[in-house]
Amino acid sequence: MNFETVIGLEVHVELNTNSKIFSPSSAHFGQEQNANTNVIDWSFPGVLPVMNKGVVDAGIKAALALNMDIHQNMHFDRKNYFYPDNPKAYQISQFDEPIGYNGWIEIELEDGTRKKIRIERAHLEEDAGKNTHGTDGYSYVDLNRQGVPLIEIVSEADMRSPEEAYAYLTALKEIIQYTGISDVKMEEGSMRVDANISLRPYGQEEFGTKAELKNLNSFNNVRKGLIHEEKRQAQVLRSGGQIQQETRRFDETTGETILMRVKEGSSDYRYFPEPDLPLFDISDEWIDQVRLELPEFPQERRAKYVSSFGLSSYDASQLTATKATSDFFEKAVAIGGDAKQVSNWLQGEVAQFLNSESKSIEEIGLTPENLVEMISLIADGTISSKIAKKVFVHLAKNGGSAEEFVKKAGLVQISDPEVLIPIIHQVFADNEAAVIDFKSGKRNADKAFTGYLMKATKGQANPQVALKLLAQELAKLKEE
């Protein structure tokens, strides 16, 4: 029997506000344990939460970006559970009226077609703290993360393969990143994914029993975990077994999912309205104001890059993968850069440098201005493409003017025949054996002189001019 895979994803996104959702403590990542806390985070008796308006702004922005309806009479609820990293013994979240609902985004499938994935809801909530277990037998609680604002985005179970899940996460991350409400860095915990997967016989409308996958710390691991779970469930069903509702974690080493716990039913968190926070009236004017702040999104930019700049769909997708790169490209083209040349550099040398240095394009010295300046120096023959790579590395590390560095470093390309011809003659004099081979008609003997000439000029000879002059002087040499 063949089975259809059914996947839904729950994505927690940490919002990049300066302060926490209900307290004035800093929400910044990477501080000393419990440095970003105050009496509200520690839940001292008598303290009350105060709503951070910036979090609501971010929630509205996310809802609009994900084509969602907005609950304009919004409220919060208490989600009751006990855990050491949750000092209140409840989490302030949203239950029956999330800020956003009934949304969708489009993903691109492997065959180039597009598919709409529905989004059930997006709700605001506070993050919990973090437990660490020491080698001394004690467990320690760090409440820096307690109260950091989150938006949880819950998809409908519309994905039918691990690849579709991967495409959905990629598209969702791009959209959220473009809004500016989060840096969506999984390695820092600002984007976390739980996956729900079940199988059902083709043609059956009712969902099968699902398993929830956790410990998915990268998009690749989401895909790998789903692939393994898909195979595991199919094997169980084909052997006559039944799938239990359970939570499993993905083991990165083995590539397998491992049982954490069996769920006997839905967790009862005894939700009830948060009594310490008022209802929030999100007016049409408020929504319209946030709408004005929305950027041009990746899909719109890709279409523009293909139609207006003549780039391929692949190039357009690569350039819009991050807003920073896309903004860089647009500014470079706006100041006169050739779109294809700028695209080639951003996808080639620039991308390699960023990967090797583990940096983003905003963190290096390269700017749209000095990249366009460098490309112009290549176009007018001032420097060769080979020399340009050296210039690029300098600009990336130090910034500044491309033209000034080229002049200061003596990297200007040699194009003057009166300079090149004496160098060619010296190459002949320094390589008598190669001259003898060439005169005797040895096959490909002329090719060696190209390397000798470039070495003699330290790569600064203009290739087109140099090769033409070299052919001319070799012809004379043969006649001697």
Swiss-Prot record:
Pfam family membership, one: GatB_Yqey
Q: Which reaction does it catalyse?
A: L-glutamyl-tRNA(Gln) + L-glutamine + ATP + H2O = L-glutaminyl-tRNA(Gln) + L-glutamate + ADP + phosphate + H(+); L-aspartyl-tRNA(Asn) + L-glutamine + ATP + H2O = L-asparaginyl-tRNA(Asn) + L-glutamate + ADP + phosphate + 2 H(+)
Q: What is its EC number?
A: 6.3.5.-
Gene Ontology molecular-function annotations: asparaginyl-tRNA synthase (glutamine-hydrolyzing) activity; ATP binding; glutaminyl-tRNA synthase (glutamine-hydrolyzing) activity
Q: Which residues form a coiled coil?
A: none
Signal peptide region: none
> Among its keywords, does the record have Hydrolase?
no
Q: What class of enzyme is it?
A: ligase
Q: What keyword terms does UniProt attach to this protein?
A: ATP-binding, Ligase, Nucleotide-binding, Protein biosynthesis
Q: Does the keyword rRNA-binding apply?
A: no
Q: Which GO terms describe its biological process?
A: glutaminyl-tRNAGln biosynthesis via transamidation; translation
Q: Which InterPro entries match?
A: Asn/Gln-tRNA_amidoTrfase_suB/E, Asn/Gln-tRNA_Trfase_suB/E_cat, Asn/Gln_amidotransferase, Asn/Gln_tRNA_amidoTrase-B-like, GatB, GatB_C_1, GatB_Yqey_C_2, Gln-tRNA_amidoTrfase_suB_CS
Per the record, the similarity remark reads: Belongs to the GatB/GatE family. GatB subfamily.
* UniProt cross-references to NCBIfam families, sorted A to Z: gatB, PRK05477.1-1, PRK05477.1-2, PRK05477.1-4
Please describe what this protein does: Allows the formation of correctly charged Asn-tRNA(Asn) or Gln-tRNA(Gln) through the transamidation of misacylated Asp-tRNA(Asn) or Glu-tRNA(Gln) in organisms which lack either or both of asparaginyl-tRNA or glutaminyl-tRNA synthetases. The reaction takes place in the presence of glutamine and ATP through an activated phospho-Asp-tRNA(Asn) or phospho-Glu-tRNA(Gln).
Subunit info? Heterotrimer of A, B and C subunits.
The identity of this protein, by name, is: Aspartyl/glutamyl-tRNA(Asn/Gln) amidotransferase subunit B
Lineage of source species: Bacteria, Bacillati, Bacillota, Bacilli, Lactobacillales
Please name the gene that encodes this protein: gatB
